[in-house]
Design a protein with these regions (language model features):
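SF2 helicase/translocase NTPase motor core
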Residues: 1-26, 30-129
Length: 129
């Protein structure tokens, strides 16, 4: 789908790009995910300012919503992701994949940091909801 952002969406994307610590506080359905993904794409592939992004979200949102949003928008083609959900072996396999974005549910953050055995080497962290 072609992304034709509203002015507020362009403003929000630019705000994220210009501020290393930012919050996008909009009502449901106003495009927080695509705003954030547009900024991530720019930071990963055009500015080369980040190399690895962690998105922390509720289980359903991390498993279903974020992948659907990444796949939905034409301008995000080439954006790679891995869903770090499931059994411990499935989560470890997901972390071994080469991707720009790693999607994880909140309940697994402690495991990721303290028990997974993988370094916490993310350049950017997004906390959803």
């Amino acid at each position: 789908m072609k992304y034709n952002p509203h002015d507020y969406q362009t403003y929000a994307t630019n705000f994220v790009l210009e501020h290393p610590v930012a919050a996008v506080l909009l009502e449901m359905g106003l495009g927080k995910s695509v705003i954030t993904l547009t900024a991530i794409f720019e930071l990963l592939y055009n500015r080369f300012e980040v190399g690895k992004v962690l998105v922390i979200a509720p289980l359903r949102v991390a498993r279903d919503t974020w992948p659907a949003e990444i796949e939905k928008w034409d301008h995000l083609k080439g954006l790679t992701y891995s869903v770090v959900i499931g059994t411990e072996s499935e989560r470890k396999e997901a972390l071994r994949k080469s991707a720009g974005i790693y999607l994880i549910n909140r309940e697994n953050v402690d495991w990721l940091i303290n028990k997974s055995g993988f370094p916490f080497d993310f350049d950017m962290v997004v906390i959803d909801e």
